[in-house]
Every structure is written in C-alpha cells, then in structure tokens.
C-alpha cells in the first residue's frame, strides 16, 4: 500500500510521529509538508488503494488556523486515513474532531486517530518527547489502524464552530546576535518575518519555529513576562500524560 504523510509541523514534533507511523507501513512513503508557505495551496487526489496519515499540532485546543486551509486541496476517493494530533501535555480538546470533520468532507475514511504528546512550544514541558517509546507505540498503532476496516472508537471532542485563534500571545524577538542568514524568513510558515528579520506580530502564529531553528539563538523570548509565564506553565504541566490511540 502506498502511504503519504501529510503534516504541519513548525517545531518537528508532528513530523517525527507521523513519519514514524508512515515508515512502519511503507518504507518508501511520500511526504507532503504543508508547513512551508509554498505548500499552502498544494493539490493532490488520492485513490482508495492508498493510505494517508494526517498530522497537526494543537494550538489552544484546535488545529492551527493557518494550517486548516492547507488541507483543502487534498482530496480522497474513499481513501483510508489515520489522524494524529500532537499537543504539549495540556489537552487536545477538539483538535481530533476538527481533523476528522475536514478529512471526511474531503473524501477520506478514518481508520484510526491518535492524540500524541510532544514538547510544548512554551516553557520546558515534556522535553524529549516524542521519545523512542512514544514512536514505537505510534508504529504499532499505525499497523493496527492500517488493517482496521471500520473504527469502533468514537473520536473525542466536537467539531468546533467559527475560526480558530490566529496564534498565541508571545511573539519572538530578534537580538543583535542575528547574522541575517535568512533561515527564519525562509522557513516561517506564515511569512511573518520581514526584510529586517524582525517578526511581524500581526502575522506571527507563535509557533516558535524561528526560535528552534536559529543557528545563533538570536530569535528568543527573553522577557521577564515570558520567563515568569514559562516557569508557571512548566510547573503546571509537569505531570506526564500518555498518548491516546483510537481504533
């Protein structure tokens, strides 16, 4: 079976999990990475003989507002699919239900869904996850889901009404250490970084991709307000949550 991994993954958590699943089913799987702005309007049709794994991060209980439209050009023809929502140890709320609604409207048949824990964008929460134990569980789940003709489990949550919030409160700063290499501008999912390499707060979705990818750590959130919040949030979400799999 030909497998395609589709994901929006600014900091790499979703990519790791989805590619682990895809690799367990097809060592030659195809990738459609809709994180990149140039993939925002990608179009592709899939047959009933293929399988697609969709992966999305959870922002405030939903999939990112910038990501949802990037799935609209991907159409199935009774195509089996697996859904994976990755979240930072708080909760995934309605994200899986939102993904399910989009997938079904676009012609996909859901054979499994997963709520997966990864490092949170903010603070130092679940650093190192997904770990190898997580990824091995993901692979085992994918093998079962691929053989699943009809889901027996109900996907938690409800399809949300209205548009998702555009992004979080905290917008990355740029220090004088910036060497203007252009990595942040090139890889920003929403082109929120200008010619001066500063982050435009009106477009930024607070994914922190630029912070994680900056080779000289010039992109940062080094403010008293953020440090205080991150310390509180890290403590609040310190208890490990386990992944949830639905078949």
Regions found by a protein language model. Name each.
Residues 174, 179-205, 209-226:
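Iron-sulfur cluster-binding cysteine motifs and their immediate structural context
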């Amino acid at each position: 079976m030909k497998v395609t991994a589709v994901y929006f993954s600014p900091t790499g958590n979703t990519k790791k999990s989805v590619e682990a699943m895809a690799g367990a089913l097809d060592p030659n799987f195809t990738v459609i990475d809709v994180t990149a702005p140039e993939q925002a309007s990608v179009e592709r049709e899939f047959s009933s003989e293929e399988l697609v794994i969709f992966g999305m991060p959870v922002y405030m209980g939903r999939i990112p507002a910038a990501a949802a439209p990037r799935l609209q050009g991907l159409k199935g023809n009774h195509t089996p699919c697996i859904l994976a929502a990755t979240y930072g140890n708080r909760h995934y709320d309605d994200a899986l239900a939102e993904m399910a609604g989009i997938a079904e409207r676009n012609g996909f048949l859901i054979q499994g869904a997963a709520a997966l824990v990864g490092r949170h964008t903010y603070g130092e929460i679940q650093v190192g996850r997904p770990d190898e134990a997580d990824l091995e569980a993901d692979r085992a789940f994918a093998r079962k889901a691929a053989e699943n003709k009809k889901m027996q489990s109900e996907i938690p949550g409800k399809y949300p009404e209205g548009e998702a919030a555009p992004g979080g409160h905290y917008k990355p700063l740029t220090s004088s250490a910036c060497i203007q290499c252009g990595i942040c501008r090139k890889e920003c999912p929403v082109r929120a970084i200008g010619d001066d390499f500063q982050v435009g707060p009106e477009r930024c979705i607070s994914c922190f991709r630029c912070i994680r990818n900056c080779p000289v750590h010039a992109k940062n959130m080094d403010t008293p307000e953020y440090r205080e919040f991150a310390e509180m949030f890290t403590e609040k979400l310190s208890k490990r949550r386990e992944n949830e799999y639905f078949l």
